């Protein structure tokens, strides 16, 4: 019998001695028991097992979290599939980093108090009524032993930081959080921090998951220290407030041979594969959050919409995987299916639009696009954003807007076949092969060139009757970015061939005299034939990465050629 005894993590579930358990679905069966309360009490032994310790983790994987809670592979598979609903400290399993570029340090307090076990040998054989109770249930095991205690997790998360600062921030946080036990002096808080440590605590927050009832959950480092120091008292002098931590289960087949038994368990290797897939999908969602909180994304609803859509599709796919696992796992344990049916689902992912390679490539392209948009906006700061074509028209038709120039991102609203394939796959439709839509290196470099030129034009022509805007409006004819020039509310197509873009140069030619520009009537637009000069902007291109420095050369104004009457944005 000892060799068939199972041990499972309680995960803050309300286990009691003599309770039924269905190991096929990893679920408790409350309300049914083979013995009355007096019989259970008379046949229960108890031993004191007082202990406490703490651990620190900087990992956010399911593997590291389940290790802190001593969860074995089979129960982990049930949790990953959604068969097990966790409570108390085990809710920590569901807590994920919001951002990829975020430092996280977790402090765990673990305590044990006592162990209770049921003496099965003294309970005798079952009568017909007890056998009938077993047959009416779906139980496979009975609870015969429980280790009591409590867990508490203090999860410290930094604010979003730059990618190259994550490790440094994590190291600083870990060094400080490791000192928490030292702040407990005979049950009282002695919190002495340096100015540097005090400044550090302002850069991260705290979340609490525990088997303790606190007056209020801590949200700061100081509150976390105060809560930690008071935890031992909350267990009670005799551990009366402790909860089940670990449970021992004996198969019911030893009491009734007709009880269905657990035939197979999920292999550790397969559980790790499932874990990796689900963690990978969550990391993709976290990468999306990194981009979504960028200020420039909030300025462009089209960027926000496509990132949110990608994030939701990944979430739907993850839920779909879990739904399938809920059906397959019990069948494998009952011997009705083998592991190949579950492994096949994992393998199919790599052929689907949700493969790691395809999702990562899509995000790479989108993050690069966000970086370039950010770079352009940084070059032309303080320019008014207009949400769409309608708002742009309203601005350029305003009475005071004699001249209007709008820097247009022309490719942000392009349809995305990758997202369409993801949606079709979830709907059960066959997906065609597709590559992420991305803007070429040449176009990306031209976008920043045009932004520098636009900035030079703003500096030279700004005045009460000259307006400048930024917008995202689809225009497939000019990929990347373009400049729209309006005079008296009219878009001048002759000026740079509809919206002013010719690839390969950063020079700008305008048929507008700055002095005359500011003297013009707000009602009568000027003739578009004035020509005062050709302004050139030279740039030294550097890799288009977030927060990298862009080298710039001071713009030069070339000599004016009066014979050239064209107006072009090359």
Residue ranges and their predicted role:
Residues 1-333, 424, 429-439, 443-446, ...:
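Membrane-permeabilization and membrane-interfacing ectodomains
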Residues 340-476, 480, 494:
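Intrinsic low-complexity, polar/charged intrinsically disordered segments
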